[in-house]
């Protein structure tokens, strides 16, 4: 599918942007960087068509690199509706989020893991864009971790329910008012922080195993260690990974 290939290409470009920006440790985070990252991921504006109950079709435009102009919400896995910040609130909340991050980073009271977790949670409660918020949130987490010389992390699809449950439990502690979540303190996000700490710890552990692996029969894929009976399989798989045209 052409669209899938385009999205993968845009995601790779976005990841490289994050890696390059993270090297500029003396430069403060800006809203412009977040918007540019969003524009890179979405590539262009596009229309979404929805069918209304009376049989009429409506549409609206998703704007790449621009904050939302329509309210957004989600139906949780428990069937309840959860509202994010309004379009009117969003510019102020995002300004405050970026200002808070830059100040907190300078103060150094929070560890890089705490800083990344709290930024992620606050950002998710704002949901500043009409689409792509999850991808931006995860890229920004890796921007913060990489900026502080931590390994990047991946929320794998098989573990997504655990991630959503950690967010949900934190939402229950803070309540449904978006601004309460957008200004959350580290002590208010304990369920998500516990999940995030474990996620980072597992990533570090896997990285150590990967770099110390001496067995030629072992191949690492999607965070999993796969052992083969002979090294020939791993040689073939590594060749296919580096040369995608091989069949």
What are these regions (language model features)?
Residues 1-131, 135-247:
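FIC/Doc superfamily catalytic core
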């Amino acid at each position: 599918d052409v669209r899938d290939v385009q999205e993968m290409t845009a995601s790779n470009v976005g990841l490289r942007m994050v890696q390059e920006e993270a090297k500029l440790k003396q430069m403060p985070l800006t809203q412009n960087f977040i918007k540019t990252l969003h524009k890179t991921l979405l590539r262009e504006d596009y229309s979404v068509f929805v069918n209304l109950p009376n049989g009429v079709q409506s549409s609206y435009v998703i704007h790449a690199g621009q904050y939302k102009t329509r309210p957004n919400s989600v139906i949780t896995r428990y069937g309840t509706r959860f509202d994010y910040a309004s379009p009117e609130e969003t510019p102020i909340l995002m300004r405050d989020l970026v200002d808070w991050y830059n100040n907190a980073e300078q103060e150094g009271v929070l560890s890089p893991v705490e800083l990344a977790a709290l930024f992620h949670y606050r950002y998710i409660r704002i949901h500043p864009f009409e689409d792509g918020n999850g991808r931006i949130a995860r890229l920004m987490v890796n921007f913060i971790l990489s900026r502080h010389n931590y390994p990047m992390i991946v929320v794998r699809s098989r573990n997504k329910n655990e991630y959503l449950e950690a967010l949900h439990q934190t939402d229950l502690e803070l309540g449904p008012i978006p601004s309460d979540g957008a200004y959350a303190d580290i002590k208010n996000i304990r369920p998500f922080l516990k999940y995030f700490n474990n996620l980072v710890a597992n990533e570090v552990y896997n990285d150590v195993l990967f770099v110390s692996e001496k067995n030629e029969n072992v191949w690492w894929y999607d965070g999993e260690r796969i052992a083969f009976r002979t090294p020939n399989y791993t040689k073939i798989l590594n060749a296919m990974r580096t040369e995608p045209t091989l069949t």
